[in-house]
Amino acid sequence: MDYLQITKSPTLQGSVSISGAKNSALPILAATLLSQNEVTINNLPDVADVKTLAKLLEHLGVNITWHKPTSLTCLAENIVHTRAIYDIVRKMRASILVLGPLLSRFGYCEVSLPGGCAIGARPVDLHIKAMEKMGADIQIKGGYIIAQAKGGLKGADILFDKITVTGSENVIMAAALAQGKTHIINAAKEPEVVQLCEILSQSGVKIEGIGGNELIIYGTGGELLNFAPICVIPDRIEAGTYLCAGAITNSSITLENVENNHLSAITDKLEEIGFGFNKSEHSLTLLPAQSLKPFEIITTEYPGFPTDMQAQFMALATQCEGTSVIEERLFENRFMHVSELQRLGADISLKGNHATIKGISPLLGADVMATDLRASSALVVASLVSEGTTNIHRIYHLDRGYERLEHKLQHLGVNIVRLKS
């Protein structure tokens, strides 16, 4: 099994190109199930999760041609299965995204209950209740969601009790081919959701309210869609992770291929800590701070501070002068990285969904274990300032969401190698 070995790094320098957003690529891939034409998708991130979903689509009967690791063409005219099997779905929670498109197009599907990061319960109840509201009969048997909509899905008023990104995306795709109007209240408005809506809108689905938390979708009544070529938006979480790597070493680095307006919550917090920025249309340069001030974070839905960045900022907090506080409001059990950061010497105390981090903590390299995707990136960030050598194990979590991580970090001057145990 692979692991990463990182030796304390000097000040970083140079530039890094940000990959396409994994969390946009996955619903876009699922949405190709709604198409009647060949769909070309560019700027895909070369990560395990994208390959997993592509494999699932191929199992269903989608013809996929890879042009390069970041570009493919899908043709979904000959779907032969509507059963998303456990062997593939168990590897990634986002596989649930095929539920809406399959049910909307075929009126029947079976989708294995998903796997992925072990972060709290993250139930699929919200997806199921919404589909039932649209006329589906759903049962859970033998670890599968078995969904049937005789006569097809019908538009409905969907009120999400809690904002859910994948739930919103699933219902948006289900509503695309449904009969009549679907009104989604309390929809997620992350950039990845917005891109999905924009693509469907350009493909023949009338959608009102894009970018807000109320959406009205006029379904095509079963008529399949025509997609133009798609370019996946840049990954704001990957960008934020590299900003934290630059920040913890108090370096000046440049990110290329970014959407600065998607990064406001992250860059605002870094400015509060003491960093500056030079911004141009699609690039961003981090400027060093005179000193690193402590901070407070409350994770919340977009445009608030993203839960996918709290672990990396926790690593950064160990080098800030004073006490920082992080409150996690979106997911339970999302502090699993704390014990591993403590192994490096971090002074962190937990109380419920609050973490208190005292800095400045001198960190010392050790063997640590990744527990989920973003927690593993926090260990990478912390290891950059840890004396000696840090070995990060179970990095298959990193490979799920970060493209060529060690190569990009090496380009910035990090002493990092991938080894086999």
Swiss-Prot record:
GO MF assignments: UDP-N-acetylglucosamine 1-carboxyvinyltransferase activity
Reaction equation(s) it catalyzes: phosphoenolpyruvate + UDP-N-acetyl-alpha-D-glucosamine = UDP-N-acetyl-3-O-(1-carboxyvinyl)-alpha-D-glucosamine + phosphate
Gene Ontology biological process terms from the UniProt entry: cell division; cell wall organization; peptidoglycan biosynthetic process; regulation of cell shape; UDP-N-acetylgalactosamine biosynthetic process
EC number: 2.5.1.7
Signal peptide start-end: none
Annotated Gene Ontology cellular component terms: cytoplasm
Modification 2-(S-cysteinyl)pyruvic acid O-phosphothioketal occurs at: 117
Catalytic residue positions: 117
Keywords assigned: Cell cycle, Cell division, Cell shape, Cell wall biogenesis/degradation, Cytoplasm, Peptidoglycan synthesis, Pyruvate, Transferase
Annotated residues for binding of phosphoenolpyruvate: 22-23
Binding site for UDP-N-acetyl-alpha-D-glucosamine: 93, 122-126, 308, 330
Pathway(s): Cell wall biogenesis; peptidoglycan biosynthesis
UniProt-annotated location(s): Cytoplasm
Described function: Cell wall formation. Adds enolpyruvyl to UDP-N-acetylglucosamine.
Family matches, as PANTHER family: UDP-N-ACETYLGLUCOSAMINE 1-CARBOXYVINYLTRANSFERASE
Similarity comment: Belongs to the EPSP synthase family. MurA subfamily.
Name of the protein described by the UniProt record: UDP-N-acetylglucosamine 1-carboxyvinyltransferase
UniProt organism field: Helicobacter hepaticus (strain ATCC 51449 / 3B1)
